[in-house]
Design a protein with these regions (language model features):
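Preference for solvent-exposed, low-hydrophobicity sequence contexts
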Residues: 1-143
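Extracellular/virion structural assembly segments
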Residues: 120-284
Length: 284
């Protein structure tokens, strides 16, 4: 069995030993996905059958810390969806999982949906004030993958990602179109833009998940209580020396563009081309 098709922030594998911390260059270091207690980030993956069992395991001991909580997850939005001959296991994450795990710590999921699937490590954290939240979705339609599909439009599915970061100093850019005549520049149009930036250090599986952000038509970024509706999103990945983490610089624009069409002057009082003020070229 190969890894299931999964490009969610909470990635799944066919063997928990494929988690990022077990890679040779990670040396056991855990770079978990951050969530609020009782909240598991929305995810979806291609599976071979309907879901029947869900367990939560401790990342410290790899032992189960819950009984089968599949019904609790179903109440919170877990279900199987059939699309284009694929069986997709969706978790919308729209309701909290109260009573499943009520305290901070690092955990991972063990799910049986035709076969066994194992999630990446996630961290329940009571304090996410220093986190930046990225929510992205695409109501216009689904995304196609080789041997899979990302279901978005038909299920109102939203990805949610919390990152240890905050918005840095913005950049200001200007675009200008001008015509030069007789040594003078005549401005035809000017555009001023403000671009926001942030930097975060994350493992490869989160870099994979963030590829989807740019493709989605709807992108909301929240930092320190302020929410921005991004109209563009770009990311640049710089792998660190050890190799298991990347410094990712992200930038996005919002609809704050200022435009000057230039050159047009409204003559409120009218005028005449030769100043004789008869009826030949009177302008109202």
């Amino acid at each position: 069995m190969a890894n299931p098709i999964c490009i969610s922030p909470l990635k799944f594998y066919d063997d928990f030993h494929k988690q990022n911390r077990y890679r040779s260059f990670a040396y056991g270091y855990v770079a978990p996905l951050i969530t609020n207690p009782n909240v598991v980030s929305p995810f979806q993956l291609i599976v071979s059958g309907n879901v029947s069992e869900v367990y939560v395991r401790s990342a410290n001991t790899n032992k189960r810390v819950t009984d089968n909580v599949v019904e609790r997850f179903k109440d919170a939005g877990l279900r199987n969806v059939s699309k284009n001959s694929y069986n997709i296991l969706l978790f919308l994450g729209i309701f909290p999982l109260s009573g499943v795990i009520d305290y901070e710590g690092q955990y991972w999921l063990e799910i049986h949906s035709g076969e066994w699937y194992y999630s990446e490590v996630f961290c329940f954290d009571n304090n996410i004030d220093d986190c930046l939240k990225v929510e992205y979705w695409n109501p216009e339609g689904d995304f196609a993958l080789k041997n899979g599909i990302i279901v978005l439009g038909s299920e109102n599915f939203h990805f949610i990602l919390l990152l240890k970061s905050e918005l840095g100093k913005p950049e200001y850019s200007f675009e200008e179109e001008a015509t030069k005549r007789l040594g003078y520049s005549f401005i035809e149009s000017q555009v001023s833009k403000k671009t926001y930036k942030f930097n975060t250090v994350i493992p490869e599986y989160l870099c994979d998940a963030m590829r989807i952000i740019r493709l989605c038509s709807q992108k909301k970024i929240t930092c320190k209580g302020e929410t921005y509706d991004a109209i563009t999103f770009n990311m640049e990945v710089d792998w660190q020396e050890q190799g298991d983490l990347a410094s990712v610089t992200c930038e996005f624009d919002v609809d704050n563009i200022i435009t000057n069409l230039g050159g047009f002057k409204h003559e409120a009082l009218g005028g005449d081309f030769n100043n004789d003020y008869n009826n030949d070229y009177d302008i109202e």
